[in-house]
């Protein structure tokens, strides 16, 4: 029975979106998903329903389309929106910047205009720690200077500005901006998880594919950083903790009756080799690696100060690195080719 209202989740079939839909359904919300599967898979939608015990409403469509979005709001009584729909590869954004600006900013602009027409103004936005660029001081809090070196990061930074301007122009808007650090792991059922759809861009899915035998070895970029073992340090966050952060944000918009911008991370960094060792322990497989030259633009350490999310929303990451690796391995082992 729906107790808390109906939430529209754009990009709800994706990695973070699917886990968030599970938590929303389990938490008493009804869910409407809009997704065009440009970087997700239809099987994820069915699996969301299997895990949650009840299915979301699903509409296949492009969140950039005003006609699609207007139809969604006309047919369904939407109480709030979580906006995930976006392209997300930094490398691809450097090759196809116009595609990223058109998709990531166009979908948000369409959403803002559609929400406004239908008198719905509670929005949780999926941002990224990419807006902080190359910080040399850690931990990173929300007051750190904002800058970024790639079109993907620019779209997130520009989207945050679009939302800030929208709020300034109309005090009825309530917007929660969530800056994620490094989502990893998978649902404990092994039914949903990250499906890179090719060569992984991020560390843990790459490590997982080495462990399962799909890739020969891991390249570790830099072994001479000023870190405990010389390899880079990042803040890895279990995707279920991240999903629950979105529910905390929805509740926060109602309770606080004002918007906010918060980091979502554990507040603790792990080196690349710590991740490798933890994944070997979780999987029982060796993960061969080779230390190579640093990549241009990398920093040695990047991790969040997530205290503001706890103070404002009561949210704190619960799962440790061992749990992240165990859940990610279960997904990879049970689904060696992802959803295919």
Regions found by a protein language model. Name each.
Residues 1-186:
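N-terminal Rossmann-like NAD(P)+-binding domain of SDR-like oxidoreductases, especially those catalyzing
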Residues 101, 149-157, 193-201, 205, ...:
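Short-chain dehydrogenase/reductase
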Residues 189-191:
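Catalytic core of nucleotidyl cyclases, primarily class III adenylyl/guanylyl cyclases
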Residues 185-187, 224-225:
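Short, basic/glycine-rich phosphate-binding loops at helix/coil junctions
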């Amino acid at each position: 029975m729906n107790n808390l209202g109906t939430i529209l989740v754009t990009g709800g079939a994706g990695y973070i979106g699917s886990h968030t839909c599970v938590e929303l359904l389990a938490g008493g919300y009804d869910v409407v998903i809009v997704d065009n599967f440009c970087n997700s898979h239809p099987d994820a939608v069915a699996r969301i329903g299997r895990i949650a015990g009840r299915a979301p409403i699903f509409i296949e469509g492009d969140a950039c389309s005003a006609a699609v979005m207007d139809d969604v709001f006309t047919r369904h009584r939407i109480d709030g929106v979580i906006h995930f729909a976006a392209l997300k590869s930094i490398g691809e954004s450097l090759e196809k910047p116009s595609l990223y600006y058109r998709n990531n900013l166009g979908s948000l602009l369409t959403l803002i205009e559609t929400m406004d027409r239908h008198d719905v103004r509670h929005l949780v936005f999926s941002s990224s720690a990419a807006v902080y660029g190359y910080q040399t001081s850690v931990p990173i809090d929300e007051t750190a200077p904002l800058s970024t070196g790639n079109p993907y990061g620019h779209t997130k930074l520009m989207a945050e500005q679009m939302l800030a301007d929208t709020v300034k122009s109309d005090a009825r808007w309530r917007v929660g901006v969530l800056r994620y650090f490094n989502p990893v792991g998978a649902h404990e059922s092994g039914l949903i998880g990250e499906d890179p759809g090719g060569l992984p861009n991020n560390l843990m899915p790459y490590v997982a594919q080495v462990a399962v035998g799909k890739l020969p070895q891991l390249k570790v970029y830099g072994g001479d950083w000023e870190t405990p073992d010389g390899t880079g340090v990042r803040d890895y966050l279990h995707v279920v903790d991240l999903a629950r952060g979105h529910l905390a944000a929805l509740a926060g918009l109602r309770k606080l009756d004002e918007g906010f911008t918060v980091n979502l991370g554990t507040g603790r960094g792990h080196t690349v080799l710590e991740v490798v060792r933890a994944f070997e322990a979780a999987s029982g497989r060796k993960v061969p690696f080779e230390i190579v030259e640093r990549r241009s633009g990398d920093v040695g350490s990047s991790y969040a100060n997530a205290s503001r999310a706890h103070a404002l929303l009561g949210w704190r990451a619960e799962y440790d690195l061992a749990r992240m690796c165990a859940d990610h391995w279960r997904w990879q082992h049970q689904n060696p080719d992802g959803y295919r």
